[in-house]
Regions:
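Short beta-alpha junctions and helix-cap segments that line functional grooves
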Residues: 317-319, 329, 387-388, 521-524, ...
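Structured, non-catalytic alpha/beta "coupling" segments that mediate domain-domain communication
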Residues: 74, 88, 98-101, 226-239, ...
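Single-stranded RNA-binding regions, centering on S1/OB-family and related RNA-binding modules
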Residues: 548-549, 553-725
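Long, highly charged, low-complexity intrinsically disordered interaction regions
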Residues: 4, 56, 62-80, 90, ...
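A glycine-rich phosphate-binding loop feature that marks nucleotide/adenosyl-phosphate handling sites
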Residues: 180-188, 320-324, 378-380, 404-411, ...
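Short, ordered loop/turn segments at secondary-structure junctions
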Residues: 38-40, 129, 239, 322, ...
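Duplex nucleic acid-engaging cores and interfaces of nucleic-acid transaction enzymes
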Residues: 50-53, 60, 64, 69-74, ...
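Short flexible coil/turn linkers enriched for glycine and charged/polar residues
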Residues: 15-16, 28-29, 95, 121, ...
Length: 725
């Protein structure tokens, strides 16, 4: 049997030794971000995603092995183990295979077959199964089994048939074959429930059928939702008679048996009563699990790209949380995120109130030198955008606006964290502050919100919530550690996502900072309560200290590699102090790209990946990797439905990526749908081509005013470019 390491290595296309090293590091309590960044030599430079897959797969395979041993022990206790069964158990590579093999030996509730055995009908059942009787009358033979509990020959045959049905149902071979055939030949069929209040949402699925093997995840989740709401009836349809005949043929030893018809009926009963319901349930569950996995993956990719949006630093920002009845809440923050002013204004009511609001807000924009308006994308967003565009034009203001994803802002504004951060502000104003800060530093603000509330997925409320939470937490952890955080300004909300730091330790770090006037070196982390050497090893490299005594504290170089970093600097004719001298640092940065990494690593007896990473860190101390990405799209003018028509080319921001395409915000109230057929090749997923936050140009190919739908295409633009060329 292949080792677990070999199995995972084959799946990932890496070497078994890499997997073994990664598992050893994980078992020792190291975190994925730490291993990915600082143990590259040990793992052969395995990436974050690969390490997480290894973590999940080794857990599954260990559970599989534990279950295998449980089953072997249980069967041995029953003294029913055979060499053939043992071989099959040892070959099983899925939990489902093990459970199928264990089914005949699993303790059962009192079944019809059990009752029949208790009544002495097992010998009759064996005659039926083994086809040993080829002459005489079946009822005459059955008479021999009449008793007080079995009053008639027909009752005897029925009881024996129940035993036969259970034998057939318990066959791992039959179940495995039928399961494969159902996946290959089955259809999911949907039927609309006419008197259901939700039926209008699912009209497209009335009398709908699709092959099991071809159903995309978003369609599986859609029909599942319809079933859950009682609007759809779902069923798995397969060639039942073909399957029954296959099993009858498989269990027949002699076609001349007088019990042939009895056996055929027992097989049909086994299929309809026991096998099909179980396999239908298995297949539906597998479909749902697969769809959940895909939806969660898409959500994770979208969340990652959203969190990696570059910060719009240096702006004084006015956050606008739109609303109708209670008005639009406004908050102005400075370049450090501190609240300068706030209030509520009516931007969507009477013309008089709108004019008053315009004058007052324009006055504040000039007073505080606001350069950017951040408008939440919820209720009344489009009307607020129209107001902002008109105000900027009429008041001749030197600022732009941006539409910001406000999902989760209301949840955050009422949270304990928001109360602690903004104790003097009303709950409604806190939402406006959050909308402003999300533009200033999307990562720092978004980590304060439950990732599930951010709203960049598909069917996120329908999928396995435990798995969704687990995956999204991993995404947040990966992004936060990839970017790194400033130790002296980071909130507990973001610190708790750093490798090795818990929520309690994050609060202790902030408390230490407040009591001691801030950190001056990474080493001081060891003085923080409950942050010991092991946690320090995990977290230190991801925490930056601008202005620290040791300039390496403001880089991604891990303290364990400081000595190596100094030697590299020395080899180039510089000292550590030169990193704090602008002209010397610039001179060093000219030399760094010219270094032969392999030679340097060999000379210093160090790992090539570590030397490469140290050189990259020295080249850009304190670098924020988000700065390399294109800045978000800001606007001065609103787009109206009258401005667009088929053939218009628009520029917009990718708001969400799903299995069937992407939704693009190009300044209209409704996001345009860029269907995958108008975006990418057949086998590509939209997320292979686009990411949340990307700025793209697309052509409008359809406008449905009645249904409020706009269709977009990038393929048409490519085709036009080809013709021009």
């Amino acid at each position: 049997m292949e080792s677990m390491f070999a199995i995972i290595a084959k799946e990932l296309g890496v070497k078994p030794g890499q997997v073994e090293s990664a598992v050893t590091l994980l078992d020792e309590g190291n975190t994925v971000p730490f291993i990915a960044r600082y143990r590259k030599e040990v793992t052969g430079e395995l990436q974050d995603e690969q390490l997480r897959t290894i973590e999940e797969r080794i857990k599954y395979l260990r559970n599989l092995e534990a279950r295998r041993q449980e089953i072997i022990n249980a069967i041995m206790e029953q003294e029913k183990m055979t060499d053939e069964l043992m071989a099959s158990l040892m070959k099983a590579v899925k939990l489902q295979e093990l459970e199928d093999l264990y089914l005949p030996y699993r303790p059962k509730k009192r079944t019809r077959a059990m009752i029949a055995r208790e009544r002495g009908l097992e010998p009759l059942a064996e005659m039926i199964v083994n086809d040993t009787v080829t002459s005489g009358n079946s009822l005459d033979i059955a008479k021999e089994y009449i008793s007080e509990e079995v009053p008639t020959p027909e009752d005897a045959i029925q009881g024996a048939s129940d035993i036969v049905a259970e034998i057939v149902s318990d066959s791992a071979d039959f179940r495995a074959t039928l399961r494969k055939r159902m996946w290959k030949e089955g259809f999911i069929q949907a039927e609309l429930v006419e008197d259901n209040e939700h039926k209008d949402q699912f009209l497209q699925y009335n009398e709908y059928a699709e092959p099991v093997r071809q159903m995309p995840s978003h369609r599986i989740l859609a029909v599942n939702r319809g079933e859950k709401l009682g609007a759809l009836k779902l069923a798995l349809t397969v060639p039942d008679e073909s399957y029954i005949q296959y099993m009858v043929h498989g269990i027949t030893k002699n076609e001349q048996s007088i019990f042939s018809d009895v056996k055929a009926s027992a097989v049909a009963d086994a299929y309809k009563r026991l096998i099909f319901p179980a396999l239908e349930r298995d297949i539906r569950n597998e479909l749902t699990e697969s769809a959940d996995e895909q939806a969660i993956k898409v959500f994770g990719v979208n969340l990652k790209n959203l969190l990696l949006q570059p910060p719009l630093a240096g702006h004084v920002i006015m956050g606008l949380d739109p609303g109708y009845r209670t008005g639009c809440k406004m908050a102005i923050i400075d370049a450090q995120g501190n609240v300068l002013d706030y209030g509520a204004y009516y931007l969507t009511n009477s013309e008089k109130l709108k004019q008053e609001a315009q004058k007052k807000l324009a006055e504040k924009i000039r007073k505080f030198n606001v350069t950017l308006l951040s408008i939440g994308n919820g209720t009344a967003s489009y009307e607020t955008e129209q107001f902002a565009s008109k105000m900027i034009e009429e008041e001749k203001l030197d600022c732009h606006y941006i539409i910001t994803n406000e999902a989760g802002a209301s949840v955050y504004s009422a949270s304990k964290l928001a109360i602690d951060e903004l104790p003097d502000l009303d709950v409604t104003i806190r939402g406006a502050v959050s909308i402003a800060r999300r533009v200033q530093d999307p990562l720092a603000e978004s980590v304060k919100i439950d990732p599930k509330s951010i709203g960049v997925g598909q069917y996120q409320h329908d999928v396995n919530q435990k798995q969704l939470t687990h995956t999204l937490d991993q995404v947040v952890e990966s992004v936060v550690n990839h970017v790194g955080v400033e130790l002296n300004t980071a909130s507990p909300a973001i610190l708790q996502h750093i490798a090795g730091i818990s929520g309690t330790v994050a609060k202790n770090i902030v408390a230490f900072r407040q009591e001691n006037g801030g950190f001056t070196s990474r080493k001081q982390l060891l003085k923080v309560p409950r942050l010991g050497p092991a946690a320090f090893t995990q977290c230190a490299g991801f925490l930056r200290l601008n202005g620290a005594k040791n300039p390496l504290d403001n880089t991604s170089v891990h303290p364990e590699s400081y000595e190596l970093a100094e030697r590299i600097i020395g080899e180039l004719g510089f000292t550590l102090k030169d990193l704090q001298d602008k002209s010397q640092l610039e001179a060093l940065q000219v030399k760094l790209p010219l270094v032969d990494v392999d030679k340097m690593a060999h000379k210093l007896d160090a790992g090539v990946p570590t030397v490469r990473d140290i050189i990259a860190a020295l080249a850009k101390p304190g670098r924020d990797p988000r700065e390399d990405l294109p800045a978000p799209l800001t606007r001065k003018h609103v787009v109206s439905l009258e401005d667009i028509k088929v053939g218009t080319v628009v520029k917009g921001t990718v708001h969400n990526v799903v299995d069937f395409g992407a939704f693009i915000d190009f300044g209209l109230k409704t996001n345009g749908l860029l269907h995958r057929s108008e975006l990418c090749k057949a086998k590509q997923h939209p997320s292979d081509v686009l990411a949340v936050g990307d700025i793209i140009e697309a052509e409008i190919i359809s406008v449905d005013v009645k249904r409020n739908r706009i269709g977009l295409s990038v393929k048409s633009l490519r085709n036009k470019d080809k013709k021009k060329a």
